[in-house]
């Protein structure tokens, strides 16, 4: 059954500067449908039940650290239940229209048993406790969480929101102005996420959350779910044009986090330093959902900082024989991050180098993924820290499928072997057969496979083999030890830039909107820091070319193109290299052979 949240309730939480609690002000609220079933994520079922128990050790454990504050599991789940109640309650309208104060007692009395029927809820927040409670509250209320990228310009946000038919935006105050503006252009409602009180919070209006009061009956009710229900839509980076919505169910999420927690031995003693985006499966699953499932602690660093990471590790391990209580034990990043960390290390004075290397060596686990890790970077990192980075392989559609072992040989240049329960098939390019030794397209069948591409049934169907294997579009092979080697994309139109898979076609379509651009071709050229660099070959329009010649300057500069495009493309999609040509080499069918063009430029540019 498809229910549009707008038709169920128009609930808007808006900041009121003069009210004692600006996050509890409501307007135009109509009742949600209340059905006798909840839709919390399956991975939370046992955790929620355990936390709900009186005196549970799980309840007092630190789940999230952010902005120098700590948040327990009980506080997170209590706050998530309040968000569920806000989304699903019919009582809030009455209290607002009657001019009554919305009190903690009133909120505690809300049932939280509403069911959003799979309505999509956009989550817009920096990495924080509020982001986590926004997702959990959406799941508890029966909604589907759609994390929205903070780096997206307005045009891309509008595409994702319109495509997924988002009915409600949950946002923090720092993104309120932009998201209210965007919500006004769509059918979505807007709500602020109430701040989650930390362990040392003194916020009187929400003191009930400090103790983590939880309606146990409501939690237990809402964890009885249908695990085939959609839970999460994560948008791809746009590998075939516009980004596609990848729908994961409670079942696929559950399968993945259990697999990761077991394979990499996540425990309550682990403390993760998290500096990855939360609209990408690396940041969502590897570094957030799986640690929370294992009752670990996740410490958010909202923006990647070379100095900040090295400093946090040194604080964790002041000497080679000592550590603090909140010491970081696990770190996962993309190759570019490790390149930057190496550069930062090399710029240190000898004494700071010694302290930094000593601290890094004491972490339990360091992992790398989202794009190929250059072997020289792996070797440099191992020399500095003693860690041989654990590489693994995944995609938005199945999260993680292959990994080097936690214990055992981690082979440079490979991504390891399939996880238990995961099947990987290599299909030859002629598609007449498959084997485990030759080169071909990797196809994956896994319990964590996505349900579908959102509202793209034909694309979904064509992405699978008849026997249920997902076609990754990545070329690979298996070495003599059974380790998988990823050779790259099967299409020249796909680029991997700093961990993101980008579509050259999408970027081309935007650049062609520029009045100076007559023709363009976008491809990825090798880059030592980002894997590939977005490179644009442009044929200027005749008038622009003539004007440039008269003024003895290029028809368009990289700076001009960058400045213009940054309002239309996410930062990581912006061209960083520009070539101005008189024409593009095309075949008889009018197509540009990008593979040959890439080879030619790579040789000419010496990259």
From Swiss-Prot:
The keyword DNA-binding is annotated on this UniProt entry: no
Subcellular location: Cytoplasm, Cytosol
Keywords: ATP-binding, Cytoplasm, Ligase, Nucleotide-binding
Family matches, as InterPro entries: AMP-bd_C (IPR025110), AMP-bd_C_sf (IPR045851), AMP-binding_CS (IPR020845), AMP-dep_synth/lig_dom (IPR000873), ANL_N_sf (IPR042099)
Tissue expr: Mostly expressed at low levels in glandular trichomes (lupulin glands) after flowering, and, to a lower extent, in stems, leaves, flowers and cones.
Enzyme Commission designation: 6.2.1.-
UniProt record, GO biological process: fatty acid metabolic process
Chief location bin: cytoplasm
Lineage: superkingdom: Eukaryota
Binding of ATP, residues: 236-244, 391-396, 474, 486-489, 591
UniProt xrefs under Gene3D superfamilies: 3.30.300.30, N-terminal domain of ligase-like
SUPFAM superfamilies recorded: Acetyl-CoA synthetase-like
MF (Gene Ontology): ATP binding; CoA-ligase activity; medium-chain fatty acid-CoA ligase activity
Gene Ontology CC: one annotated term: cytosol
Region of interest (SBD2), residue spans: 392-453
Region ranges (SBD1): 305-391
Top class in the EC scheme: ligase
Domain notes: Both substrate-binding domains (SBD1 and SBD2) are involved in the substrate recognition, and are sufficient to confer the substrate specificity.
Homology family: Belongs to the ATP-dependent AMP-binding enzyme family.
Protein name in the entry: Probable CoA ligase CCL8
């Amino acid at each position: 059954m498809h229910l549009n949240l707008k038709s169920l309730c128009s609930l808007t939480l808006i900041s009121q500067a003069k009210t004692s609690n600006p996050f509890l002000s409501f307007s135009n609220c109509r009742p949600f449908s209340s059905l006798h079933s909840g839709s919390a994520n399956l991975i939370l079922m046992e955790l929620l039940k355990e936390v709900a128990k009186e005196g549970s050790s799980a309840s007092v454990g630190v789940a999230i650290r952010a902005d120098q504050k700590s948040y327990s599991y009980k506080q997170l789940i209590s706050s998530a239940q309040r968000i569920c109640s806000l989304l699903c309650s019919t009582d809030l309208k009455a209290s607002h229209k009657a001019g009554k104060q919305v009190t903690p007692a009133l909120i505690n009395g809300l049932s939280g048993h509403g069911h959003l029927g799979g309505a999509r809820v956009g989550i817009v927040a920096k990495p924080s406790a509020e982001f986590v409670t926004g997702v959990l509250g959406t799941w508890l209320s029966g909604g589907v969480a759609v994390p929205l990228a903070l780096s997206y310009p307005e045009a891309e946000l509008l595409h994702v929101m319109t495509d997924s038919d988002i009915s409600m935006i949950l946002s923090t105050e720092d993104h309120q102005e932009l998201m209210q503006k965007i919500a006004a252009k769509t059918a979505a409602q807007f709500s602020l996420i109430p701040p989650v009180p930390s362990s040392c919070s003194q916020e009187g209006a929400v003191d009930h959350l400090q103790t983590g009061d939880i309606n146990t009956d409501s939690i237990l009710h809402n964890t009885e779910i249908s695990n085939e229900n959609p839970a999460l839509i994560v948008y791809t980076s746009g590998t075939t044009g516009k980004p596609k919505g990848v729908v994961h169910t409670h079942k696929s999420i559950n399968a993945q986090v259990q697999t990761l927690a077991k394979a990499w031995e996540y425990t309550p003693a682990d403390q993760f330093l998290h500096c990855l985006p939360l609209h990408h499966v690396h940041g969502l699953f590897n570094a957030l959902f799986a640690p929370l499932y294992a009752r670990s602690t996740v410490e958010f660093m909202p923006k990647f900082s070379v100095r900040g990471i090295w400093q946090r590790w040194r604080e964790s391990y002041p000497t080679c024989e000592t550590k603090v209580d909140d010491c970081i034990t696990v770190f996962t990043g993309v190759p570019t991050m490790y390149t930057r960390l190496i550069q930062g290390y090399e710029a240190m004075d000898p004494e700071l180098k010694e302290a930094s290397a000593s601290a890094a060596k004491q972490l339990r686990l360091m992992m790398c993924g989202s794009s190929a890790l250059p072997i020289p970077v792996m070797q440099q990192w191992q020399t500095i820290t003693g860690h041989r980075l654990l590489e693994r392989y995944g995609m938005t559609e199945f999260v993680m499928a292959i990994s080097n072992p936690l214990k055992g040989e981690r082979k440079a240049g490979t991504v390891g072997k399939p996880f238990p329960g995961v099947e990987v098939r290599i299909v030859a390019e002629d598609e007449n057969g498959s084997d485990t030794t030759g080169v071909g397209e990797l196809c994956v069948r896994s319990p964590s496979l996505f349900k579908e591409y959102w509202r793209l049934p034909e694309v979904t169907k064509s992405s699978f083999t008849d026997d249920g294997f997902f076609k990754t579009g990545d070329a690979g092979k298996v070495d003599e030890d059974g380790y998988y080697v990823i050779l790259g994309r099967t299409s020249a139109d796909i680029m991997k830039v700093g961990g993101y898979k980008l579509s050259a076609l999408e970027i081309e379509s935007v650049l062609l909107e520029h009045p100076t651009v007559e023709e363009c071709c976008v491809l990825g050229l090798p880059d030592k820091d980002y894997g590939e660099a977005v490179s644009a070959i442009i044929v200027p329009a005749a008038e622009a070319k003539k004007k440039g010649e008269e003024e003895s300057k290029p028809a368009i500069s990289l700076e001009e193109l960058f400045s213009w495009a940054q309002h239309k493309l996410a930062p990581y999609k912006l061209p960083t290299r520009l070539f101005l040509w008189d024409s593009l080499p095309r075949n008889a069918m009018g197509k540009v052979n990008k593979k040959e063009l890439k080879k030619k430029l790579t040789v000419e540019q010496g990259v």
